Amino acid sequence: DSAVSRGLGDVYKRQWIELEVAKAIKSGREYIEWTTPSGFVVRQRYYKKKVERIQLQLLGRCDLSVAVEDGKEVDINRHKAATAPNLIHSLDASLLHLAVRSFDEPIALIHDSVLSRCCDMDKLSAIIRETYMLLFAEHDYLKTFALYVGAETEPPIIGDLQPETVIESTYFFC
């Protein structure tokens, strides 16, 4: 039952983001922008694609629609679909960026995989946990995002997140 409640809470947060992003675009914004905790400015632009229809004749006839370039009209549906995952990915990237800056050993990052020497993993794991705790202990990123998009409604409550619990947890990130 609590897993279902948590899942519904996640859906509600995503729906809130979609609603506020749609309002921002409808009010005339051409892009959605926010700054991550590590200082990276995300500027999300989506435009409706210009589509050309072509007919192919090869072992029969085939009609295709091909996107050839971005148009000039903002694509509200792509913004709605992309903003929540992009916000989460930007927070993940910020966490990694800030953690890696504190890690003075050899490291490689490929997408969301972290590669380091085995002998350094305990140190890296501790740094990532501490960075996570510092990032999320006293800051509500949905409230900050609400300011960036000029939200008309309050963001949903994050819930009972206790970031300090990651310090002692068996599994976290790495």
Predicted segments with their positions:
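C-terminal structured domains
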Residues: 16-108, 115-174
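Single conserved hydrophobic/aromatic residue that forms the stacking wall/gate
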Residues: 1-12
